[in-house]
Amino acid sequence: EQFHLEIQNLYAALAQPTEKLTVSYPISDGKGAEKRPSFVIGRIARLLPSISVETESVDKEYRLSARTTALEYAGEQIGGALWQYFEKQGDAKSALEAMRAASHYTRGRLSPGAVRALYGDAVTLSASRMDKARSCHFAYFMRYGLRAKERTGAGFDAPQIGTFVHDVMENTLRAAKERGGLHALSEEALHELVRASIEAYIDRVLPDLNEKSARFQYLFRRLCAAVDRIMDEVSEELKSSDFEPLAFELAFGADGQLPAITIREKNGTARVVGKVDRVDGWLHNGKLYLRVVDYKTGKKSFDLAELRYGLGLQMLLYLFTLKEEGRALFGGQEIVPAGILYTPAREPMLRCARDTAPEKIEKARKKELRRSGMVLEDPAVLQAMEHSTLTSPCYLPIAVKKDGAVTGSLASAEQLGKLSKYVDRLLHEITQEVFAGNIDADPYARTPQQSACTYCEFASACHFENGCGSDRMEYIKATKNDEFWQYIDEVNGKEARSDG
């Protein structure tokens, strides 16, 4: 009854305009997590197929429609055409003077005493902390120096969904390994293990599930069905591979299977801790080839441009650390890094016509679920990862040309060695900046509208103004494969010369 009343109210609202109707909807929430449009959007699109969907203007011209936002826009280019317009108006003198004065403002640096008071002699760095430090020094200071936190509401939010999916996948694969591996399990047997893992999660984390709202229970049931499909897909991948899961939730740190990764600088020490979702291995000719796998419930993917700027280091860091420290843990064989893979742990959203053939939908779904990452450029290793990879790869982030050449996100053993040195250099740089007291607001950005500021929880404390004082956007430039490796060679070469 309530639903029909809401539909009636919606119809009445849509029928009110006499000249123009604009319908808008968000594509992400306040934290950047993907959101699905309301079913109403789909109905409108089907009723009015000739209407195209417009995305928010990249230049945000709409800011000029109101005086307050237009003034803010003028402040981004002091002396520009819009600034000159307000100068001629004469009634914005105080605002312009304030913005000009703010352009000379600098945040400064923390004193050595303040750094010691906030961080001590050693800081703990996790994947999220490293990314925060590289994406904006001020945001890192707020979150991990002052320990400021935004208020959070109740609910089964994105991080909890990720934890649930990770938990079920880990326990299902662990149970499958104890029963002889995925090759020995039928689809029905696999689903039984999934259900057992879900029940164990409910008993441990959601014992009051039946007391939750009807909406919560519906969303949770839908999530459980999605996990079944995700596990089917992961099972298919591993059944077509010689790589086998060797470890789950492999931890680096005080209570982990491996020690924390220690970075020592003159002004302080950093200890990198974290967990690897899964480590797969292939034993060949006395060598153990390892790949590190990370489950992603969001749309995170491997990006050379981000890696160049020091974001998303953790997977490679774990891989290179396993090469140096993992020998005793995995039987004593020499370890060879074979790559890193981000595995989608979500149901993809597909844009298909209502009459699209099932086989086309499945093909589009497979494409969306292709792994991203970087793998070793070695035909034997690639074929061991996926048996059909040299003819028709389905899972790996590579492609095969008509002449049989393999392209994609590949790296030779030599290149991975160079990358290991580069990652180590970035870790030392992060450590130096933290202990130097750097609190600059210097967010990384793809565009002015797609930056570390876009969903930052500390915007109200920061008041970032690009170009004002020390505030500046650090733009991430798209990086091609050859450009990336050339850059790595240049940086490593400079470091070698300075050491010499």
Where do the language-model regions lie?
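Structural signature of nuclease core domains in nucleic-acid processing machines
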Residues: 5, 28-500
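Conserved helicase C-terminal RecA-like lobe
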Residues: 1-16, 303-304
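Acidic beta-strand-to-loop metal/phosphate-binding motif
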Residues: 22-26
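Short glycine-/polar-rich loops that comprise or flank the Walker A/P-loop
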Residues: 17-21, 335-338
